[in-house]
């Protein structure tokens, strides 16, 4: 199983960053505009449309307020397994965002990691822009 872990420090209050992450239906406006162009809620899942035209159905697995951690799983599509999480940690005058994805098949690691890096850049721009 391929495992991807990306981390970044943010000049943003942890509560503000977490509020954007936990708003699962507004990724395209509150968390990663430009990287995600639309989000629709469908029961316990969200349909995410990325700027590159890819759409993904993401089942929301857990929203842990105390740990500031969101967990989701992409269902359908080319991946036979996906578990993703974003967690916000207080750090210094700001916070640290940690995004982890475990995926199968392994050969999707490079393209998924490239997309995640684009997502990190979009999140940094949005969350630090207040």
Predicted regions located by residue number:
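Short, highly charged C-terminal tails/helix-capping segments
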Residues: 34, 125-130
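Short, conserved beta-turn/loop elements at beta-strand boundaries and strand-helix junctions
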Residues: 64-68
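Hydrophobic pocket/interface hotspot
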Residues: 17-21, 27, 46, 60, ...
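Beta-strand/loop substructures that line and gate deep hydrophobic ligand-binding cavities in soluble
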Residues: 74-126
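Glycine-centered tight beta-turn/hairpin loop motif at sheet-sheet or coil-to-beta transitions
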Residues: 1, 51-53, 79
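Hydrophobic ligand-binding cavity/cleft-lining segments
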Residues: 1-40
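A generic beta-sheet turn/junction motif
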Residues: 10, 51, 90-92
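Hydrophobic/aromatic beta-strand elements that line small-molecule binding cavities or substrate pockets
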Residues: 8, 56-62, 83-90
């Amino acid at each position: 199983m391929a495992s991807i872990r990306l981390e970044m420090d943010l000049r943003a209050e942890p509560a503000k960053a977490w509020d954007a992450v936990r708003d699962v239906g507004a990724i395209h406006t509150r968390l990663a505009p430009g990287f995600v162009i639309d989000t629709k809620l469908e029961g316990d899942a969200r349909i995410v449309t990325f700027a590159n035209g890819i759409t993904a159905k993401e089942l929301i697995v857990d929203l842990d307020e105390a740990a500031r951690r969101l967990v989701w799983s992409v269902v359908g599509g080319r991946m036979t397994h996906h578990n993703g999480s974003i967690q916000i940690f207080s750090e210094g005058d700001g916070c640290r965002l940690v995004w982890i994805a475990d995926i199968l098949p392994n050969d999707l690691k490079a393209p998924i990691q490239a997309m995640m890096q684009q997502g990190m850049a979009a999140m940094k721009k949005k969350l630090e822009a207040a």
